[in-house]
């Protein structure tokens, strides 16, 4: 189970015209706590930002699953709200449960296509209620270091 945190980084960015401008960019980090999320985003951003930067905001993000893409054109992240439809055994009524997933794609049509591909093996019936582009710049899932050995 992943716990995702949306971290906002504020720094001075050199624009295309050569001027410096203060910008705030959101990133998504997989971490166990707010403290770890802050440490991870600082570690991930340090090589890419010259000069000072601050973590201006950290909040929990409610994503149940991620569908990343290796395609170069897929440079945007789309938030998709899915509604799973199940039958209640006792009453026989339909029960709807919503969940949010994140899909990396080139555009809206591509996001829906990749979402359907990712959900192909799902046994439950679902409906796509919403697909919208997010302002997320990048996503950093947790990966164990190769030299980290589990304690015995």
Identify what each model region corresponds to:
Residues 3-9, 25-28, 37, 41, ...:
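Short, structured motif recognition centered on aromatic/hydrophobic residues
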Residues 52-79, 87:
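Extended, compositionally biased
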Residues 100-140:
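Mixed-charge, glycine-accented linear interaction segment located at domain edges/termini
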């Amino acid at each position: 189970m992943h716990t995702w945190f949306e971290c906002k980084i504020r720094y001075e960015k050199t624009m295309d015209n050569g001027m410096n401008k203060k910008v705030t960019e959101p990133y998504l980090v997989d971490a166990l706590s707010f403290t770890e999320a802050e440490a991870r985003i600082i570690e991930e951003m340090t090589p890419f930002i010259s000069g000072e930067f601050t973590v201006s905001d950290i909040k929990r993000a409610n994503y149940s699953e991620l569908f990343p893409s290796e395609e170069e054109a897929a440079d945007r992240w789309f938030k998709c709200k899915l509604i799973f439809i199940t039958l209640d055994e006792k009453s026989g009524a339909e029960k709807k449960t919503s969940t949010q997933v994140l899909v990396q794609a080139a555009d809206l049509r591509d996001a829906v296509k990749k979402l359907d591909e990712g959900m192909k093996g799902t046994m439950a019936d679902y409906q796509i209620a919403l697909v919208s582009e997010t302002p997320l710049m990048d996503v950093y899932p947790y990966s164990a270091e190769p030299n980290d050995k589990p304690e015995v």
